[in-house]
Amino acid sequence: MELLKALLLLSGVLGALAEFCVIPKMDGQLVEKLGQRLLPWMDRLSSEQLNPSIYVGLRLSSMQAGTKENLYLHNLKLHYQQCLLRSTSSDDNSGCQTKISGGSLALYLLALRANCELLGSRKGDRMVSQLKWFLEDEKKAIGHHHEGHPHTSYYQYGLSILALCVHRKRVHDSVVGKLLYAVEHDYFTYQGHLSVDTEAMAGLAFTCLERFNFNSDLRPRITTAIETVREKILKAQAPEGYFGNIYSTPLALQMLMTSPGVGLGPACLKARKSLLLSLQDGAFQNPMMISQLLPVLNHKTYLNLISPDCQAPRVMLVPATEDPVHLSEVSVTLKVSSVLPPYERTVSVFAGASLEDVLNRARDLGEFTYGTQASLSGPYLTSVLGKEAGDREYWQLLRVPDTPLLQGIADYKPKNGETIELRLVKM
């Protein structure tokens, strides 16, 4: 009896200590500038550049793009439905210039839910089946004893479970079990660093399953995993306030905002401060990162797509006025040590040029080649000087001597005198 009283007292104390993660309102002009950066991307309607995350981010934000949103969703539907239905009916996929990945399809399902659409038609059922096939294929790649890895990533795996869940579609216990095992055994730590966005996506997926009481036989493990994810994210907070890095912070905050916990209040206020400084410095330029941050600034998460409010008032965005361009040159040195003979060359580009511009300039000068592949987060390197990234390898971008870049080649803008190394590393 005394033990029971002690446990009840302890649970009461912990309950009293639990806090919500609240992000106080930020300067409206900063938030508006963030939304304005998405507008040019909504004019890019080619199959390679369509990004469902842009639509989701805007719909969960406090801003809207008017008829542009409707046109963008229309083009998303044309692209995904035509490509997916063609790929399931035959091997002829010639009408689609890019292959639809599981993560991309999952984001498209989130976009439909952001428009208050629930999958129920024959086309919708085929898309659900396609995403479930993707998860089954990834489950097989992971292996019965978890000795393997997903063909894509655990991030896409968790995102796919989340997308099906917000559409009220169940997945098999064995599929959820793989993600649970990965969280329980620290599979999202690479080279000593936690992949915060992967951890957060898994946490969002588990929280959705818990709210619907899906996979009830796994309920105790799901509840424990949610707590584990929260604790890992909080431990990954840097002294500056961000979780992991500044670009993984939006998803981390989405996860932390879903339920109360001990110590969340101060941690989230600290994260807000780091985000504010980054926004003032213009750090968020990539549409994928912006679209993950906008919901947070509107006190929403992907879990709001369970019951979206499509009638909520949103402020109309207007295009930003362009600042005058002052042309000056900077010198950037490119270094590649992962090939023989090693490569090193200094090139000149206009100030404000991206790393991709630097690579193009080096290629134009001769003796340098590289290949890329498009993704929703922007192009990434697949080969440098003829050397292809192999299985479980990737080309890492570093600022010499040894600082990994947090942005991709299309987003990072080297400063004058910097040396950028392209290094082939194993995952």
Curated annotation (Swiss-Prot):
<feature type="binding site">
    <location>
        <position position="248"/>
    </location>
    <ligand>
        <name>cob(II)alamin</name>
    </ligand>
</feature>
<keyword id="KW-0170">Cobalt</keyword>
<dbReference type="Pfam" id="PF14478">
    <property type="entry name" value="DUF4430"/>
</dbReference>
<dbReference type="GO" id="GO:0046872">
    <property type="term" value="F:metal ion binding"/>
</dbReference>
<feature type="signal peptide">
    <location>
        <begin position="1"/>
        <end position="18"/>
    </location>
</feature>
<dbReference type="GO" id="GO:0031419">
    <property type="term" value="F:cobalamin binding"/>
</dbReference>
<feature type="binding site">
    <location>
        <begin position="395"/>
        <end position="397"/>
    </location>
    <ligand>
        <name>cob(II)alamin</name>
    </ligand>
</feature>
<dbReference type="InterPro" id="IPR051588">
    <property type="entry name" value="Cobalamin_Transport"/>
</dbReference>
<comment type="function">
    <text>Primary vitamin B12-binding and transport protein. Delivers cobalamin to cells.</text>
</comment>
<feature type="binding site">
    <location>
        <position position="292"/>
    </location>
    <ligand>
        <name>cob(II)alamin</name>
    </ligand>
</feature>
<keyword id="KW-0964">Secreted</keyword>
<comment type="subunit">
    <text>Interacts with CD320 (via LDL-receptor class A domains).</text>
</comment>
<feature type="disulfide bond">
    <location>
        <begin position="165"/>
        <end position="208"/>
    </location>
</feature>
<dbReference type="GO" id="GO:0006824">
    <property type="term" value="P:cobalt ion transport"/>
</dbReference>
<feature type="disulfide bond">
    <location>
        <begin position="21"/>
        <end position="268"/>
    </location>
</feature>
<dbReference type="Pfam" id="PF01122">
    <property type="entry name" value="Cobalamin_bind"/>
</dbReference>
<dbReference type="GO" id="GO:0015889">
    <property type="term" value="P:cobalamin transport"/>
</dbReference>
<feature type="binding site">
    <location>
        <begin position="193"/>
        <end position="197"/>
    </location>
    <ligand>
        <name>cob(II)alamin</name>
    </ligand>
</feature>
<dbReference type="InterPro" id="IPR027954">
    <property type="entry name" value="Transcobalamin-like_C"/>
</dbReference>
<protein>
    <recommendedName>
        <fullName>Transcobalamin-2</fullName>
    </recommendedName>
</protein>
<dbReference type="GO" id="GO:0140355">
    <property type="term" value="F:cargo receptor ligand activity"/>
</dbReference>
<feature type="binding site">
    <location>
        <begin position="152"/>
        <end position="156"/>
    </location>
    <ligand>
        <name>cob(II)alamin</name>
    </ligand>
</feature>
<keyword id="KW-0171">Cobalt transport</keyword>
<keyword id="KW-0479">Metal-binding</keyword>
<keyword id="KW-0813">Transport</keyword>
<dbReference type="InterPro" id="IPR002157">
    <property type="entry name" value="Cbl-bd_prot"/>
</dbReference>
<comment type="similarity">
    <text>Belongs to the eukaryotic cobalamin transport proteins family.</text>
</comment>
<keyword id="KW-0406">Ion transport</keyword>
<dbReference type="GO" id="GO:0009897">
    <property type="term" value="C:external side of plasma membrane"/>
</dbReference>
<feature type="disulfide bond">
    <location>
        <begin position="116"/>
        <end position="310"/>
    </location>
</feature>
<feature type="binding site" description="axial binding residue">
    <location>
        <position position="193"/>
    </location>
    <ligand>
        <name>cob(II)alamin</name>
    </ligand>
</feature>
<dbReference type="GO" id="GO:0005615">
    <property type="term" value="C:extracellular space"/>
</dbReference>
<keyword id="KW-1015">Disulfide bond</keyword>
<keyword id="KW-0732">Signal</keyword>
<feature type="binding site">
    <location>
        <position position="245"/>
    </location>
    <ligand>
        <name>cob(II)alamin</name>
    </ligand>
</feature>
